[in-house]
């Protein structure tokens, strides 16, 4: 299965725990840190709960890019350029402009995702996600709201675990997803550079979202933060996942802080793995 990941016991977690804790703010906790070899799918480091599914939030854009390329909707990094219209999601200033695929990924533009999901439709989205092993592949949206194409991946029905995220990314970078090679290469090109550490060049996608309270409102003090992607050095590729959850409200998104924390931890992680 494309999204399959092979787990082996990781023996260094206790030794690294004290080192990694220093870079994580006291107001957030790591749910999972996961590193795996992209070619063999072997987990090299696993710490925390990496099996529970939560919303993918904007990390879903990577899978959506593969789907849209494969379906012929996305043609290149700059096609199609779609016009912004009043009424579209625009709570970030950079979203209020005509947007192409490169801008979509860089600025994490929700309304562009919504136009792509509408063009794909629920049936194709579900079929692709099932073939990718992408979480529960549930695009139904909020119960009774008929909004699956608009927000199923944002604190709604679509859920994925860190292990499943790693499996999807491993299949993507290893060229093993059941899509055209052009679709995989095009999607990878869109993913932004995440930083360089210890000679490793990281590329990944952040994601931020809030869990729901019992009354359906968002719990803005308990936001999730994702950073999901791959790292390259010489001829080797590793896939990584960092998932955090806040314990109080923050001005900076959880995804950006998860990215920065993983970058700060990367050198210690690589030393612990002997890489």
Question: What is the meaning of each model-derived region?
Answer:
Residues 53-80, 104, 165, 240:
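Active-site SXXK
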Residues 70-86, 179-184:
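Short, well-structured active-site flanking segments
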Residues 49-53, 119-121, 173-275:
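Structured C-terminal helix/loop/strand segments within mature extracytoplasmic catalytic/sensor domains
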Residues 26-48, 229-230, 242:
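A short, well-structured edge-of-sheet supersecondary motif
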Residues 1-14:
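Bacterial N-terminal signal peptides that target proteins for export
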Residues 13-21:
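Bacterial N-terminal signal peptides
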Residues 92-93, 97, 101, 117-173:
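Mid-domain, small-residue-enriched loop/turn segments at the edges of structured enzyme/sensor domains
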Residues 46-51, 97-98, 106-113, 144-154, ...:
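Flexible glycine/proline-enriched surface loops and loop-helix/loop-strand junctions
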